Amino acid sequence: MRDNVERWIIHEGLQSEEVKNPENNFQILVKHAGRYGIPVDVFEPKGQPGILVIGAKVVMKNSQIARYLGFSAEEKERFEKKVNDFCNSIQVINKIITEDGKQKVGVYVVMDDKENINQQTMLDAIDDVSEKYDKTSRFLLKTF
């Protein structure tokens, strides 16, 4: 899987770098991907060989992070439910994470139809994640 993904990325002329992550068999960061030219991770989770996950992380603004960190447990739960409901409505898996001291909302598309993972479907998924990243970013600006 890794060799195919690397070859497809090179064939498309996309800039990328390998990311070390013990949770994944491999992880590649595509630096400027999709319509919006955002950084996108392409990886195969260790517990799910043959599954390809495409994801991007929306970094919350400093004012949003400060507000989020000031939330009570109940308010955080309500906020996370709002984000989750929105992401479900645009058919993307999400995860709120803290990374490099910043709150981020990861948006992910899972490619689990092993027979149909190829260069075109991966590129389509990258474009899809790029678009859903933009929608999630705008959602956060409007509602938070």
Model-identified regions with their sequence ranges:
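Short, internal acidic amphipathic alpha-helical interface segments
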Residues: A56-K104
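Charge-rich, low-complexity N-terminal segments
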Residues: M1-I51
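Short, aliphatic-rich beta-strand segments
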Residues: V105-V110
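C-terminal charged interaction modules
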Residues: D112-F144
